[in-house]
Amino acid sequence: MVAILMRTTTWFAALFLALLPACLFSQGSQDAAVISVDVSHPGAAISSSMFGIFFEDINFGADGGLYPELVKNRSFEFQEPLTGWHEFLGYSAKGLDSPKGELSVHTEAPLNQTNPHYLRPHAYEPGYAFFNSGFRGIGVEGGAEYRFSAYVRSAGPKTLRATITDESGHEIGSGKLEGFDDHWKRYETVIRMNATAQHGRLNLIIDERGSLDLDMVSLFPVDTWKHRPNGLRKDLVQLLYDLHPGFLRFPGGCIVEGRLLTTRYRWKNTVGDIEKRQTLINRWNDEFDQRPASDYFQSFGLGFFEYFQLAEDIGAKPLPILNCGMACQFNSSETAALNQLDEYVRDALDLIEFANGPVTSPWGKLRADMGHAEPFHLTMIGVGNEQWGPRYVERYKVFAAALKAQHPEIKLVVAAGPFPTGEPFDSMWSTWRQLHADIVDEHYYMSPDWFLTNTGRYDHYDRSGPKVFAGEYAAQSVGATSAENRNNWKTAISEAAFMTGLERNGDVVQMASYAPLLAHVDAWQWKPDAIWFDNLRSYGTPDYYVQKVFANNVGTRIIPVTPEAVGGLYTSATLDENTHELTVKAINYSPSARGAEIRLTGINPSGTIKIITLASADLNAENSFDHPTAVSPESSTLETKSGNIPVQLRPYSVTIYRIPAE
């Protein structure tokens, strides 16, 4: 009996060991999934602006970032007028042991009344020097050219020398302005750098005794996007361009609201001559105790004209957001009285004229004078940013009455508050349905699990009601506003799963954008962010690449697909009626590979399938300056001769199949 039991046990053990690899493989690869795509019954059209971008000046995204001015506080208009400017006290650059002098700020007989402050350096001895520290340093590339300029007035010294020094104090570039007189004039010279510095300084030296007056001191790269004199930083715009975004929402965000109405964003102060654009404190100056930024202001070198121009450059529809008479409801919640809204409504009407009006109109003429006689083709405006409640609705009605009467062609985007659920959200949606609003902006900064479990969020939205703008969203690895949030593969792939739901419901969801877009690695206030940069370099995060592969592979019509979301598999399908391609997106949120078969009804393709894959077996994987494409798209192909296409989905992967559909 014992012997029989031992022999039986040995036989079962051998059988178990023989079958173990097959069992493990079956569990590891999971059951083969069938992805059924019915091309014979195409659904609704998808908005051509489905996946876009949202730019807000947070994390030093504008000054110190997309707008590549290297001099901080160039017009001396910060609350502390000498912010960013320093004498050589306790600091010695090579050859700059500065003789005595002093810096003072004045307002008599200014360059203009909009920005009245200017600097008066006085040299007691020849060789007096002072410097600007830039935006967490001044970054310059060896061999590159930079335009050094300033408005100068002087009855004394006739020259001003400029040197750029690296982190060790070594001079890596120099130039000189000269020929001053006692009237304000702009002078410039081009400086070629002979070495690279990530955190350099701009030093200014007066070689004669006496004083001179300085304003709008600038060090600006010559090589900008499209080589414009007041252009944008090339590498950052290239990353935006590569997204092929359907729209550009600007300039915010909470900076539209301001802490107080006096510090709200006013678009009219951001156009025209750059030296006359009124400097303003940034809303994110001191929002978070853990990331204070007392030197965070807005010069508006990047203003509404430049935003419209950027949208045009990258092929995106412009979506400006305007203050509706309400300051940030998380701060002062200050509200303009209903009988004081004329100024706010006038701003909206004048903006339409600035963007679309004839050159014979006042604001259309300004657009033409700035170099763009053709209209910018504005089709939509946001009324308020992240507002909610009865006061908001009252003010929206005033805007809507005026705008719809004069410009019925302009769609109005309204807010549903800052959160994706709860009483304020539900109340706002009920109101917007009653008022037949055009587009409702929803925001969600939630956990990765929330994104995974909400892929069907829009499956049951009313198809006859307002359209949806998923205006701000990002998976938070720790929690909203946490300084410990990461841009890792887990956040990115969860967003991808959610985006399949946006795409499948493209008849309701008209637009979607990740937020925030940009962050300076040394000057951020908010994590996570799609693109990180320093003074010289930049890279896209895994979240950026998810946005890219979706925006670059969106069709023109929804195609029914099953399963939509089951067992860690999330899918969507679209047809591009222009290229005659069927695009199938499959997200495998599983640590194991998964076999699948794409079964097509309505077409029998033959030819080459283009495959784009984003994948990492490590959910904590991130990109970095040293490894900017650690998680990034890979391309491959697959030949097919039928409508039954076997595929293999990698662990934790986003895979896109572009299938011939002639």
Which stretches of residues belong to each language-model region?
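Solvent-exposed strand-to-loop "edge" motifs in beta-rich extracellular domains
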Residues: 151-155, 192-194, 552, 587-589, ...
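Bacterial N-terminal signal peptides that target proteins for export
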Residues: 2-13
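Catalytic-core region of carbohydrate-active enzymes that cleave or remodel glycosidic bonds
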Residues: 401-404, 408-411, 429-432, 438-553, ...
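Carbohydrate-binding surface patches
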Residues: 568-605, 611-614, 652-658
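Active-site cleft segment of glycoside hydrolase catalytic domains centered on the general acid/base Glu
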Residues: 173-177, 186-188, 221-223, 227-231, ...
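Conserved, mostly hydrophobic/aromatic
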Residues: 53, 150, 244, 311, ...
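Bacterial N-terminal signal peptides
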Residues: 11-23
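Extracellular and organelle-lumenal recognition/adhesion modules and their flexible linkers in secreted
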Residues: 27-299, 317, 332-342, 349, ...
